Amino acid sequence: MISCAEQRSRSRQGEADRAGSGGSSFPPALAPGSCFEILSAPGISMHLAGPHKAESTMRRHEEKDAELDRRIVALRKKNQALLRRYQEIEEDRRQAEQGGMAVTTPGLLQPDSLTVTISQVPGEKRVVSRNWARAPLSPGVTTTLTDDEDAADAPGTFSMGHRVELAVTMENKAKAKRIVSEKPTTQARSPRAKGTSGGGRSWRAPLQMTSSSDSAGKGVLEPRSPGVVSSPPPQQSLGLSPEASWDYTQWKQEREQIDLARLARHRNPQGDWSRPWDLDKAKSMPQNCHKPRDRDLAMGSRKGPRTHQKPQHPPSSLDGKCRGGQSGRPSMTSTIGSNAQGKERLTGRARRYDMKEDEMLQSQEGSQSSTKTPSAEEEFVQKRNEREPDRQETVPATSPIPASPEGLKGESGTSTASLAPDSPQHSDLAPLDLSVGGASSRKPGKSTCILGPKAGAQQSPVSWPNGSEQQTLGCTDHQPGLEVHSCTESQRKAQTPEPMEDRAGKAGAQENLTPRSRPPRGIGPRARGTSKRSRAGGPGPAGRC
């Protein structure tokens, strides 16, 4: 068995031989087959691998640091470029502001005029400075207004002999340029001492400007006092800008013109209403052309049609101008509100239509109530005829309410039927006499038939309108319970509906042509009821036609 010393010696010799021949670079401790390799090889390998990894991580960290440095440098360059660009933009903006101001002054530079044209920069304040006097000003005399002072003091401060600063806030919807002009008077050297319009007004109040459009499309802003009204009265309301108030004024004028044109179409050339339902409107009351509309609204009156009425004592032209050529509001009709409810609020054609409907309903109800009774009686007569087939006499179903001339003739013919006075127990009626009084030429008159409960002949006078003929009818009806019926044929005609005329006329013609025979005395109450109806001519209760 080979000892470790021998193995070491052999390994050293082999290593020397390999070193001479350019062999492997393994250390003696790592030579294959050595005891050191067998015993301590894992510990040495771990010791050698640690520095290798440390070097690689160091290299990676260095590379990352270098990359970060390069990025930092690039960002610094970009920031510098951005800063330079921002500075250039700011410088260009300042130069543009200075170059955009065109100061136009007269040749002598009078101190009572100043016109400055400012290029618009939306949402920013621009300070315009200009000396009122020709003499140069010392730095100590000049006064400046910062943003804080603008917030605390008035927006504009004017002082003769001092530096003038006007702070203007432009609106986004404004036009490209605004001309700010201020013309103070020569006596307004001390504007704070004298509160007048123009430059002499008190500048303690905020600067108010009104815009007016000219032919060039530029708005001119001129400061004005609250009490002074400019030529176009915009009627500014609280919280509205000058442009908004101007737009509202234009819109209001257009709406008034449209309303006037619309209402003018509803009138004829004579000035009257062309529509029939406008005729019931109240007549126009004379009003002053310059009467303010707000006063009427405050009184709570409702406005009528805003149009020109007929020319009255103060003649007014079609364009709404009063005498003297002064423009004014058109005459208006003032009406008083009504508290009526329901159908009482209807006026004119609507009220007439409603009344017509009520009349039609009433006539229909009357016709229905009048047609119910005749139909019931006709059914009763038909049933009676069916139950008594043995009877030889014929009882025609008569119409109790004749309305046509034919029906009147039939009833008058029936009433002229007379009984023989000498034979009270005669059971048959005499044939109809159509020749008495000219039945065809009779007019509606008053026919009275008196039937009493007593036995014996009763007198029944019949009077005609001309009074030429009178006939006494003798009735031998001994049946008790008969009543008096009197009616006027004109009233019958009035109560009869129009659809009953044809049927009544046919029934009257049948009565004229059919002979009537009276039933014997021994027949029961049916005959009495039939006689009652046939003589009275009316189906209803006693006294009804």
Curated annotation (Swiss-Prot):
Q: Does the keyword Oxidoreductase apply?
A: no
Name the residue ranges with Basic and acidic residues bias. Answer: 7-18, 342-359, 380-393
Chain ranges passing through the membrane? none
Instruction: Tell me which residues bear Phosphoserine.
Output: 404
Does the record carry Coiled coil as a key word? yes
For this UniProt record, the keywords arranged alphabetically read as follows:
Coiled coil, Phosphoprotein
- Per UniProt, what is one Pfam family of this protein? DUF4594
* Record's compositionally biased regions (Polar residues): 328-341, 361-374, 457-474
Q: Please state what the protein is called.
A: Coiled-coil domain-containing protein 9B
